[in-house]
């Protein structure tokens, strides 16, 4: 197939954005690269079908919620379509000091946020690892199946206590409102009650103990931990990072920017939320719907390696879509494709699972250094191997193909949600995007933003995508402010 034919039929290929890598490649290696890269290409027709399937699945999820609110039945819809229970959006005029716990990956943050009432926030925060906590000997730290719920939430409480002490907030008898970003699938009967359905991203805390997290209210677990540690704080809202992104964008977007109706996460995990115009019809208490789209499974353009990845994962046959687009998996997809292309030329470390992470892939994609020194450094660090020029070429082409596919599916997701909202037909609105894949990877960000017009055509100008400023941390604190102030806040229409 000629380069013209590829560009015409493949939405993941654009000559302008293809990595420039002027290294001569022998014919056999070139054939092997194309053999595997072709498994990752997505045609325009495939992406259009993906968007249609996604829109249809959204409608199925809404209908399922109308029949049985807060009960997810997987065979009815792959989306959980959860109620955020958030009825109001911030105006940018909220003031005060609020705290947030941001938990959605292997690290978590304790956040102190001061809102100035003019759409600006001063944030102080501490970041902590949950995998390498010295007090526990579990293989995966506090994310291990042998770690208990009490151990995990006591750790959160102690970190909040520390940052409150740094600002003398422990001496104040006033109970501080805390927003809790808990970025895992939950059912929420109310804004301050959120029951974990199941762990994702390979986390397993409590599964092998009598003190699990799954099936329990994480808000109560957190408040009980505050009581045990004698901390003057109380969780007033639980949300996920996607909802937090929407709330953060709404508060900080600035005057003149259209309203924010979509929040998207593209980081360690992936998810989205949106304003549902017909929320009453489908029996939602809130107007922002948490989609939980990682489990989407309708005619996905999978490769053989995706199926192998799924087979060896902790949650086999679940979250397949997330495994194709999220940062938690992209590095491992790159590694497996590299092993298939290089075969006997691989170092011993290249055969080790998860030895190459998504951050390293981002370095490769954004590498403009002389002789691609940055790419060589991350390859050496990951695999203890000095790459030849040809091998660097392979690495760059594989990274491009893997991340291209992720960006194509992500923009298909955004386009599908925009079509569901229908506001795009007649007016402008904003989509806030957070997560390291988008915010910290300029190459990926460009791919995502430039090509929405492929799907939305002349309506693309009505959708404004902006990077969210710490949706999961600031967004939780902003939501806590909205609830705690109990002000007369304009509601979404």
UniProtKB/Swiss-Prot annotation:
PROSITE patterns (UniProt xref): HEXOKINASE_1, HEXOKINASE_2
Catalytic function, reaction form: a D-hexose + ATP = a D-hexose 6-phosphate + ADP + H(+); D-mannose + ATP = D-mannose 6-phosphate + ADP + H(+); D-fructose + ATP = D-fructose 6-phosphate + ADP + H(+); D-glucose + ATP = D-glucose 6-phosphate + ADP + H(+)
CDD domains, A to Z: ASKHA_NBD_HK
Superkingdom to which the source organism belongs: Eukaryota
Pfam families (alphabetical): Hexokinase_1, Hexokinase_2
GO biological process: glucose metabolic process; glycolytic process; intracellular glucose homeostasis
Function: Catalyzes the phosphorylation of various hexoses to hexose 6-phosphate.
UniProt record similarity statement: Belongs to the hexokinase family.
Annotated protein name in UniProt: Hexokinase
Organism: Plasmodium falciparum
